[in-house]
Amino acid sequence: MGKKRVYEFAKEMHVDNKDVIDIAKNLGIEVKNHMSSIDQDQEAKIKGMLSKQSAGKAPSSQAAKTPAKAAKTSSAAHKEAAKKPVAASAKSNDHADVAEHSQKNAKPAAKQENKPARSNKTSDGKIILSKSTILRPRSTQTAHTNTNHNRGGNTASANNTANGRNSNRSNNNNNNRSANNANRSGNNNRSNERNRNDRNRRFDNQRVTGPMPRAGRPTAANGNPRPVAGNGGKFVKPASERQQPKRQEAVKPANAASKRSEQPRTERPRTEQPAATTNQRFTKPAPVPAAAAPKPASAGSQDNRNSRRGGGNSNFGRSNSYGNRNGFNRNNRRNKKNKRRQQSAPKKEMPQRKERPLPETLIYEVGMNAQDLGKILHREPAELIKKLFMLGVMVNQNQSLDKDTIELLATDYGIDAQEKVHEDISDLDKVFEEENKNQDNLQPRPPVVTIMGHVDHGKTTLLDKLRHTHVTEGEAGGITQHIGAYQVKLRDRLITFLDTPGHAAFTNMRARGADITDIVVLVVAADDGVMPQTIEAIHHAQAAKAPIIVAVNKIDKPGANPDHVMEQLTEYGLIPEDWGGDTIFVKISAKFGKNIDELLEMILLEADVLELKANPDQKAVGTVIEARLDKGKGPVATVLVQQGTLHTGDPIVVGNTFGRVRAMTNDHGRRVKDALPSMPVEITGINDVPQSADKFVVFADERTARAAGEERAKRAQEEERKNTNHVTLDNLFETMKEGQLKEVDVIIKADVQGSVEALAGSLEKIEVKGVRVNIIHQAVGAINESDVTLAAASNAIIIGFNVRPTALAKAQAEQDDVDIRLHSVIYKAIEEVEAAMKGMLEPTYEEKVIGTVTVRETIPVSKVGTVVGGYVDSGYITRDAGVRLVRDGIVKYEGKLGSLRRFKDDVKEVRQGFELGLTIENYNDIKVDDQIEAFTMEQVPVK
């Protein structure tokens, strides 16, 4: 067999679960509760312990046999008494009623319910049993409740003869009196019939054999008794009716009460209650004899006092068996008690709002309202408005307050007031300087080297050799057009190189390169010597106070003279170390890679002397090397990190724009997440294309970055408006003189911002008498429809540098006759614009007839004019073409088409052989057989 649950074992052994659990724990068996399982061995152990305990209790059970025998004797006495005549029983009952009244009126007797039973004798020698004699000892377990008690049920009846049913009922009611009183409130609302059924079901050993007839209302017809005035409101029936039992019941032994009285009784604390009464339905009161009818004067008051106290009558407030109500509803009393208890209970205090202390100093801003001040002062806005009202200031909670009002309010509260000082977060130069001055946690960083020199002296070839790539082949004409930033690794050390253009147009870009560099490598061709851009590069490097390393290139060419180059450079303060100076000269050949490693070693040596360091743990700051507008990525900027570390997702302000770093790409085209100091990266995620040499600063959050970027953009726009020249009396003559000049309107679009600036500066420097260049728009990116629309509206020329027009822009330019010039070398762009300014300024146009129409029919239409119907004889007719009306070889009118239709549809063009309908704008004198010529004006190319 398997294991068995504790509760199953306890059920088999007829013991309590708790006893089994206690025995199991004493035996060391692991049992938690009645649902725990025990095996056969454990079951045997527990059985043995239970048998030992039962053996120990055997003597006590034998000692209890003597009271049992006495109980049997008393039971026999009851049976004999039941066989006596009915008259004796009636007489006994009458005396019992008298005893009951005397027992009730005695206060001490009512309070001694749990005392041992004692017998009393009347004057005639008859024995009267007290109520406590028939009480059972209180059960330790909870009994089924039955609250149907009546006053007459508590009468200690000695009548054990004819009316055995009443005796048993009274005994039963007394046995369950404690349980009934405890649960009286739960069954008050039950009907009488339901209570009777409950009682019969719960006490099977006392189940009656027949139904109990219900007494009706007392009338003359049925002869039911009425209450007797001197009997405390009881109904008294004739003794003859009470002598006949109406149903047979199981009669208990008469000595049951004595048996219970002999057993030891334990009292438990209980609330003192008045004596409960038995149910009137089961025990009908006996008529009071004439001798017992007179009562003391205090009996009525005593009964009233008992009834006022409740009297323990569970039928109080409901209809009795005779149809009368027995008082008011007990629930009302219970509700009143609960209400009094709630009123007497201590009430919970409402939570009070904690008053927060005032700040020592009120830091305010001009324009704050009462609501804003309330948050700072930890006060309600209504309180502040009330205080201001008392001070003579009428405001509402949303009205802005001036400085004096806020200080007056602070004085009333007894605190100081201080106006908040706003820090200009849009001043990037100040932030940039503060971050650069930060000397905490400095670590060595790679040097930033800028390669400078004249055009075609081999700068890009040298850098190409260093990176082992072929950058020069991708440049148009072999000339570097914009800055490139690269990193080279030598002996586990990095060097950052910047390649600057050598053309004169890129002066600003060279100056920017010198500003952000640590070391300048000046490349000079051994065969050409010092050239104008070489001298300019020297000046930029000296202005930036950057050390210069001279790389004499092309020493492999025939006719190369490095010593002559060294002599020329001494005139500009660059004296070789061999000649007693401090400038490092390295003779190299970039094409063949000669002495390249020596040049790199000299760069690292110079970097060690400079002790270059940066703090990688702070917020990143740096400089924009180049910027452009990518078709797929949007604005793209090449930046050089100078301090801190730039991370993907950092809020950033670049020049006059802002954004969040979406992605970073290094010089090899690979995505990176972090950019350390001296590392060039290409970033995306900014809102607009910044200018070259703009500073960038990383902010703590995007909100601050947005505010700083918008403020800088606003200031830049205001500065641009200030630069507009307005006409005044002082410059009126100059303005009129300039009005006589012819202007060449130009729109410049380039791939990067540096190229845009260089091309614009070069075009503005062109000097032609009577003509000047007016750059109406310059931007980075491809030529789009907006540029073409602007050019068409202002009659301007579009110059594209390393960019191409979009398909839609190209089609629109052809339609609007906008001239687009595309270049990849800056020389040709400058020369072409200069040639146009010197004599071929005004374009030449010639007329070209594109088609003719013969008028077949004319239809006058109101509010439209004359509609012409005809066929296209030759060529084609377009909607935007000019028309000329010819009649008999004479031109009658020249103008534009008003509309062009084919059937009911508006069309842009009708070809030869198709019929059409048209109108001529502002002309209606059209006749049949007139000829209409369509023509366009085409520009003659400049030769």
UniProtKB/Swiss-Prot annotation:
<comment type="function">
    <text>One of the essential components for the initiation of protein synthesis. Protects formylmethionyl-tRNA from spontaneous hydrolysis and promotes its binding to the 30S ribosomal subunits. Also involved in the hydrolysis of GTP during the formation of the 70S ribosomal complex.</text>
</comment>
<feature type="compositionally biased region" description="Basic and acidic residues">
    <location>
        <begin position="191"/>
        <end position="205"/>
    </location>
</feature>
<feature type="compositionally biased region" description="Low complexity">
    <location>
        <begin position="289"/>
        <end position="299"/>
    </location>
</feature>
<feature type="region of interest" description="G3">
    <location>
        <begin position="499"/>
        <end position="502"/>
    </location>
</feature>
<protein>
    <recommendedName>
        <fullName>Translation initiation factor IF-2</fullName>
    </recommendedName>
</protein>
<dbReference type="InterPro" id="IPR006847">
    <property type="entry name" value="IF2_N"/>
</dbReference>
<comment type="similarity">
    <text>Belongs to the TRAFAC class translation factor GTPase superfamily. Classic translation factor GTPase family. IF-2 subfamily.</text>
</comment>
<feature type="compositionally biased region" description="Low complexity">
    <location>
        <begin position="142"/>
        <end position="190"/>
    </location>
</feature>
<dbReference type="InterPro" id="IPR000178">
    <property type="entry name" value="TF_IF2_bacterial-like"/>
</dbReference>
<dbReference type="GO" id="GO:0003743">
    <property type="term" value="F:translation initiation factor activity"/>
</dbReference>
<feature type="compositionally biased region" description="Basic and acidic residues">
    <location>
        <begin position="259"/>
        <end position="271"/>
    </location>
</feature>
<feature type="compositionally biased region" description="Basic and acidic residues">
    <location>
        <begin position="92"/>
        <end position="103"/>
    </location>
</feature>
<dbReference type="InterPro" id="IPR015760">
    <property type="entry name" value="TIF_IF2"/>
</dbReference>
<feature type="region of interest" description="Disordered">
    <location>
        <begin position="46"/>
        <end position="359"/>
    </location>
</feature>
<dbReference type="GO" id="GO:0005829">
    <property type="term" value="C:cytosol"/>
</dbReference>
<feature type="region of interest" description="G1">
    <location>
        <begin position="453"/>
        <end position="460"/>
    </location>
</feature>
<feature type="compositionally biased region" description="Low complexity">
    <location>
        <begin position="315"/>
        <end position="330"/>
    </location>
</feature>
<dbReference type="Pfam" id="PF04760">
    <property type="entry name" value="IF2_N"/>
</dbReference>
<feature type="compositionally biased region" description="Basic and acidic residues">
    <location>
        <begin position="239"/>
        <end position="250"/>
    </location>
</feature>
<feature type="binding site">
    <location>
        <begin position="499"/>
        <end position="503"/>
    </location>
    <ligand>
        <name>GTP</name>
    </ligand>
</feature>
<dbReference type="InterPro" id="IPR000795">
    <property type="entry name" value="T_Tr_GTP-bd_dom"/>
</dbReference>
<feature type="compositionally biased region" description="Polar residues">
    <location>
        <begin position="130"/>
        <end position="141"/>
    </location>
</feature>
<dbReference type="InterPro" id="IPR009000">
    <property type="entry name" value="Transl_B-barrel_sf"/>
</dbReference>
<feature type="compositionally biased region" description="Basic and acidic residues">
    <location>
        <begin position="346"/>
        <end position="358"/>
    </location>
</feature>
<dbReference type="InterPro" id="IPR023115">
    <property type="entry name" value="TIF_IF2_dom3"/>
</dbReference>
<feature type="compositionally biased region" description="Basic residues">
    <location>
        <begin position="331"/>
        <end position="342"/>
    </location>
</feature>
<feature type="compositionally biased region" description="Basic and acidic residues">
    <location>
        <begin position="110"/>
        <end position="124"/>
    </location>
</feature>
<keyword id="KW-0396">Initiation factor</keyword>
<dbReference type="InterPro" id="IPR044145">
    <property type="entry name" value="IF2_II"/>
</dbReference>
<dbReference type="Pfam" id="PF22042">
    <property type="entry name" value="EF-G_D2"/>
</dbReference>
<feature type="binding site">
    <location>
        <begin position="453"/>
        <end position="460"/>
    </location>
    <ligand>
        <name>GTP</name>
    </ligand>
</feature>
<dbReference type="InterPro" id="IPR005225">
    <property type="entry name" value="Small_GTP-bd"/>
</dbReference>
<feature type="region of interest" description="G4">
    <location>
        <begin position="553"/>
        <end position="556"/>
    </location>
</feature>
<feature type="domain" description="tr-type G">
    <location>
        <begin position="444"/>
        <end position="613"/>
    </location>
</feature>
<dbReference type="Pfam" id="PF11987">
    <property type="entry name" value="IF-2"/>
</dbReference>
<dbReference type="GO" id="GO:0003924">
    <property type="term" value="F:GTPase activity"/>
</dbReference>
<feature type="region of interest" description="G2">
    <location>
        <begin position="478"/>
        <end position="482"/>
    </location>
</feature>
<keyword id="KW-0648">Protein biosynthesis</keyword>
<dbReference type="Pfam" id="PF00009">
    <property type="entry name" value="GTP_EFTU"/>
</dbReference>
<feature type="region of interest" description="G5">
    <location>
        <begin position="589"/>
        <end position="591"/>
    </location>
</feature>
<keyword id="KW-0342">GTP-binding</keyword>
<dbReference type="InterPro" id="IPR027417">
    <property type="entry name" value="P-loop_NTPase"/>
</dbReference>
